[in-house]
């Protein structure tokens, strides 16, 4: 089974992916972790690396390559803002494609708690990062990140806790056509 989970920072994609991975024994591949690792390898902050990635398409190409390679082996949770799009462009059909969304201030608070940062600083970074990524996705892939038409399920994650979001997805998996 291949499941893609996408969402902007702070929507709960990583938490949800981990819960699903544990429940179904699926490998968890996260584009964000790949991106963060690459930033660390180059001794850059996420903001610096996002700016670098805007003009260096090899960053996205490497992340994409790793995601497609993982998906070709099957049985995984593929987490990333473009995970669903990358598989679609590679003609790999996931069993379930999910997008999590949440109110921007809810996301900002979650990020500030996760990163142990002041809310105002977290908001500034979040806005900058998302603008950078939106521009990059449009230029490199001709993808509008706000286009949710490829997803089977879109969940407003600020309405439920992590277990509530997990339960919704679990029911969807149980009811997938064989």
From Swiss-Prot:
The protein's matches in Gene3D superfamilies, at most eight in alphabetical order, are given as: P-loop containing nucleotide triphosphate hydrolases (3.40.50.300)
Q: Main location per UniProt?
A: cytoplasm
Q: Which UniProt keywords apply?
A: ATP-binding, Cytoplasm, Kinase, Nucleotide-binding, Transferase
**What GO CC annotations are associated with the protein?**
cytoplasm
Molecular function per GO:
ATP binding; CMP kinase activity; dCMP kinase activity
Could you tell me which InterPro entries the record lists for this protein? Cyt_kin_arch, Cytidylate_kinase_dom, P-loop_NTPase
Q: GO terms for biological process?
A: pyrimidine nucleotide metabolic process
Q: Which protein is depicted?
A: Cytidylate kinase
- Name the gene: cmk
């Amino acid at each position: 089974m291949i499941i893609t989970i996408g969402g902007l920072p702070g929507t709960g994609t990583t938490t949800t992916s981990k819960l699903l991975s544990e429940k179904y024994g699926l490998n968890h591949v996260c584009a964000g972790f790949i991106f963060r690792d690459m930033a660390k390898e180059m001794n850059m902050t996420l903001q610096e690396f996002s700016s670098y990635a805007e003009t260096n398409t090899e960053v996205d190409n490497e992340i994409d390559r790793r995601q497609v390679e993982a998906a070709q082996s099957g049985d995984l949770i593929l987490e990333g803002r473009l995970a669903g799009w990358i598989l679609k462009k590679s003609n790999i059909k996931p069993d379930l494609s999910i997008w999590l969304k949440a109110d921007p201030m809810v996301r900002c608070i979650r990020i500030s708690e996760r990163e142990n940062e002041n809310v105002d600083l977290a908001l500034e970074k979040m806005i900058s990062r998302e603008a950078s990524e939106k521009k990059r996705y449009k230029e490199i892939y001709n993808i509008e990140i706000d286009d949710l038409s490829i997803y089977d399920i879109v969940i407003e994650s600020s309405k439920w806790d992590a277990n509530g979001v997990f339960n919704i997805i679990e029911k969807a998996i149980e009811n997938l056509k064989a």
